[in-house]
Amino acid sequence: MSQVHKHAIPSAIAEHALINPTQYQQYYQQSVQDPETFWGEQGKILDWIKPYSRVKNTSFDPGHISIRWFEDGTLNLAANCLDRHLAERGDQTAIIWEGDDPTQSKQVTYKQLHHDVCQFANVLKKLGVKKGDVVAIYMPMVPEAAVAMLACARIGAVHSVIFGGFSPEAVAGRIIDSNSKLVITADEGLRAGRAVPLKKNVDDALKNPGVKSITNVVVFQRTGKPGYWQEGRDLWWHELTAGVSADCPPEEMNAEDPLFILYTSGSTGKPKGVLHTTGGYLVYAAMTFKYVFDYHDGDVYWCTADVGWVTGHSYLLYGPLACGAITLMFEGVPNYPGVNRLSQVIDKHQVNILYTAPTAIRALMAEGDKAIEGTKRDSLRIMGSVGEPINPEAWEWYYNKIGNAKCPIVDTWWQTETGGFMITPLPGATELKAGSATRPFFGVQPALVDNIGTVQEGACEGNLVITDSWPGQARTLFGDHDRFEQTYFSTFKGMYFSGDGARRDEDGYYWITGRVDDVLNVSGHRLGTAEIESALVSHPKIAEAAVVGIPHNIKGQAIYAYITLNHGEEPTPELYTEVRNWVRKEIGPIATPDVLHWTDSLPKTRSGKIMRRILRKIAAGDTSNLGDTSTLADPAVVDKLLEEKQSMKVPS
């Protein structure tokens, strides 16, 4: 592979950093040797109604998977995100909203957000929503989505946020599984200038005979085009809130009371409703936000994630608001109306901290300098990456072009199920290597194990497991604790299995190699798809690549690569040969792709994750059952890939 560059901690960052290298070592040692004391102290980042005396009560033992943190403490999430800031920063901006249309933006102060949340919480109560009831939220990226989530938390209702990109079938499935009482939606969403028919999708979802629990649909007016309207069931947000009191005391919640359910996308069969509870989750979201982004008062922070993704829960809303931060919520996409939109938003709002996904970075990288045209981006101090391993070339481009070669990049590894960051750099404490998630956060004990569960020491490669609990950990899968144990704790007994593979280098840094089901076994050699994809994307003409294995009667598996070229590049037989030789040079002959499939776009979820399950089936010619494609941002991509596959002439 290409030479690994090491980036030192910039002196401008080191000078003011909340955590330095010595402190990282001290805190980390204490956090794993004496978690009771460490987390007992860190839990004070929140305001508790009744302080906890029990900190950690967890078991990863087979048949006894139980995760409880701060279990005798009580608190309210909305009070921690809003009320406690009013005296000192009531007039400070809480949310900067940037519309899909660049001419639309607004700022919401902590005082205003508190008012709107209390008012809407009273509306929910009037509609019969009680503590413990589940409320489905299917909203565009508007401040009212945050209001709805915080209002649920204020009264002790459990929210189940559903991606605005999900189909009616997916919405119905989640409503049925969670037994949601109410749906909160909008007439339409706006994305890249196009309307998204949210209300129509809800109408279609509610036609499913399995949906029996919904009493009302609350509709926020975004575009003024509601379409079908069912009197008695459908209610306008603005009519419900008119004249309603904004006095709503926060419900006292036990630390282990459920806070939200979030369904993980892309798996076949019944959706998995990951359940997070109140206390441990918020301690972890607030603490990871503060230290990983090195957040200082007054910093403008922008996480580009949708609220329907766990990143939107933990790092667009709850982590930042618990810390009294200024958080930017963006309705649009990074390349609309022009490919320099992301850079324009940074300049317009003087963003100091940017957190986005490799898929967005690679899309901008394919446009070259057009992505930064007419912008300075000199307000940026810290940048982050989330969602999948970032290949070193994209990392370096992000670092040099977007960040002007002065901003540390926190490449964060974590999952819906972990609640917050697990392996990540700290800006003032970690030297960076492009493409590495570096070291574990406080209290996180990763290990690499072989396929029979033997822990591997030193520099090695293996299955990434976590050997003990942390406060942000999901407690169960909603209504299915057996499946929770089966999915995460049965492969390697006594350990949480992430489903990812990783390697650890001689400095103890972790490199995520991709999902373990994305590991190829070519002639007995283990190859991570992320490694081959990195090599492909380092080719100057390639924008994006996804690699899967297909059955091969001699090698076991052959390498099938889907490739999107940069703007203006065309596939040719010469390029086909050149790309195969390129990978051969970068990794070795064993990693040479057997098949290159040129395509304009890959099947992705709204959160930007490539759906490899579908790519594997298309590559193998197994098109009989592609499974659930309703979670795709653009389901038409699948038909296009199938057509391309039919017409492919594979050079020998």
Swiss-Prot record:
CDD domains: ACS. GO terms for biological process: acetyl-CoA biosynthetic process from acetate; chemotaxis. Mg(2+) binds at residues 537, 539, 542. Its cofactor is Mg(2+). PROSITE patterns: AMP_BINDING (PS00455). The modification N6-acetyllysine is found at residue 609. InterPro entries: Ac_CoA_lig (IPR011904), ACAS_N (IPR032387), AMP-bd_C (IPR025110), AMP-bd_C_sf (IPR045851), AMP-binding_CS (IPR020845), AMP-dep_synth/lig_dom (IPR000873), ANL_N_sf (IPR042099). ATP binds at residues 387-389, 411-416, 500, 515, 526. Acetylated. Deacetylation by the SIR2-homolog deacetylase activates the enzyme. It catalyses: acetate + ATP + CoA = acetyl-CoA + AMP + diphosphate. CoA binds at residues 191-194, 311, 335, 523, 584. It is an enzyme of class 6 (ligase). Belongs to the ATP-dependent AMP-binding enzyme family. PANTHER family: ACETYL-COENZYME A SYNTHETASE. This is Acetyl-coenzyme A synthetase. It comes from Serratia proteamaculans (strain 568). The gene is acs.
